UniProtKB/Swiss-Prot annotation:
Keyword ATP-binding: no
Protein name (database record): Thiol peroxidase
Chemical reaction(s) catalysed: a hydroperoxide + [thioredoxin]-dithiol = an alcohol + [thioredoxin]-disulfide + H2O
Enzyme Commission number(s) from the entry: 1.11.1.24
Signal peptide: none
Organism: Streptococcus pneumoniae
Gene: tpx
C-alpha cells in the first residue's frame, strides 16, 4: 500500500513503462517560469518522479 504522510493513497490509470510516451504536463521553475514537457521536444529527457 502506498501512503503519503501516513495516509493511504489510491492511484488510478495505468502505470507507465520504460519507453512509453509521457503525457504533456507543466511545472513552475524556481524563477517562477512555467515549463512544460513540450518545451523540451526533440531533446532527450530523464524524468525522475518521487
Amino acid at each position: 500500500m502506498t501512503t503519503f504522510l501516513g495516509n493511504p493513497v489510491t492511484f488510478t490509470g495505468s502505470q507507465l513503462q520504460v519507453g512509453d510516451t509521457a503525457h504533456d504536463f507543466s511545472l513552475t521553475t524556481p524563477n517562477l517560469e512555467k515549463k512544460s514537457l513540450a518545451d523540451f521536444a526533440g531533446k532527450k529527457k530523464v524524468l525522475s518522479v518521487i
